Amino acid sequence: ITYQYDGAGNLIHSSDNGGNSMDYTYDGAGNVLTQTDELGRTATYKYDQYGRLLKLTEADGSTTSYEYDVMDRIIAVTDAEGHRTSFTYDKVGNQLSMTEEDEATYQYAYDKKDRVISQTNPLGASSTFKYDGNDNVTEAADENGTVTKYAYDKNNNLVSQTDGNGNTTTYQYDELDRKIGETSPLKETNEYRYDAIGNLTKSKDPMGLITEYKYDSLSNLTEQISPKGAVTKYDYDKHGNVISVTDPKGNTNQYSVDLNDNVTKMTQANGGEYTYNYDKAGRLESMTSPLGYTKNFSYDKVDNVVKESDSLKSTTTYTYDKLHNMKSSTNALDGTTSFSYDKYGNLVKETDPLGRSNTYSYDLAGQMTSAADPLGKITAYTYDPAGNITDITKPGGRKTSYGYDKNYNVTSVTDPMGYVAKTVYDKDNRVTEETDALGQKESYTYDKDSRVTSITDKRGFTTGFDYDAHGNIQVVTDKTGLKSHLEYDKNDNLTKVTDALGGVTTYGYDNMDNLVTFTNAANKITNYTYDLEGNLTSIKDPAGRTEKFDYD
């Protein structure tokens, strides 16, 4: 990177080998007046007599304006659409409020140490905070009053977190304050080990399964070794960009990277190549697939995509408002879809190419309160103070209600007929029981890695699951106790299923992990072929009949 300065020591030009550059001009006080990039896009800055920024004008002409008090604090910001956000402060400079468009006000309160002790949203709902002597948050109560508690060691490392249901997760650290353990409320522990410079070298899950990591001298990950010994390898260029990834079966994807660290080519293990081209600003201009399909992109001065076209002659154009919200999407085949927004940036209207509109309303906290379809039928939404949906009322007054525990897991759903479905969770927030509106139950058990080990259905029948070291289902035990055995390759593709009666089904894959052969228990074979992009091109059944597929 090269730099140029003027006589006053101001940076006036910077550039790199990738073609990126930036030019600057200044006023007599050393304030930046203009900033121009390699594409000639210029942002301009205007200041008052005190050197405070009054207006920022972006390359597309959109502006943001700023107002200040006598203490040089920003008291108002007006965006490119004229929407004004104002701020107030206490005597020591803590922000007391933020008001959007003179309507939606967020308020903040502080203790004597200038720490935030409460935040109140425009609906009047507040969250509160407590601290220890080192300014660490020890309690956080949300808008519903649900409290999460935190504890720390002498080095201010988080050592425990207790959720709203009273379940505690603990954390352990080494002498260098690196996390070496995490224990769940059910006493299931993940362990971590590091090298001398802080790279993670080993992780052990609650089942005792170990994953190892190896690095080069620059701390780039070079190998990841699974609990079953499967190795994934990574190679890098001198800038630290990944240039190849080799999976456990020895299949390699290769990458080419330009001077701006953009991937310009990806060569798959099957020889298929994807190429990518970029403009001077590093924006993707075009991409070409292995079969020659090309997609092109055009941008406006502030990096919004304004046009997409492809080699199939399909073109879509986009327009935006001054805040960069999409106003319209136009396709020659489909027509134009348009979008409108309120002064807070919420989508309030969406009109399809046939002129049919969906409209939306929001409360001052930005929560959607209603949605009306093109026929004017309205669905209404209500929320609890913490923002969880409590009721959805569809046209005709059909209301569905939701109940939650203190961790905001959904515990009940009451349908419009008044029937209630219930869900029970364990201390790790895993579903252990579901009861439908008719009172029928399904239950679940888990191992220490949170994998489902059994499902008991509504008839009381239980199916059991055992897993290998990669988390693949290895044995399925049905309700009668009969077992099916499953096997996998190094990439965890299912290769063989032996059912309880000894019947064997096998699966074969190519170097892209696409299924290419399926052999059923009667030794009948089905073959599959694919193109370089992974699209299925043919299926040949055991009788020799072939079905072919083409793509546009």
Set out the residue ranges of the language-model regions:
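Beta-strand elements of repeat-based all-beta scaffolds
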Residues: 1-16, 20-37, 41-58, 62-79, ...
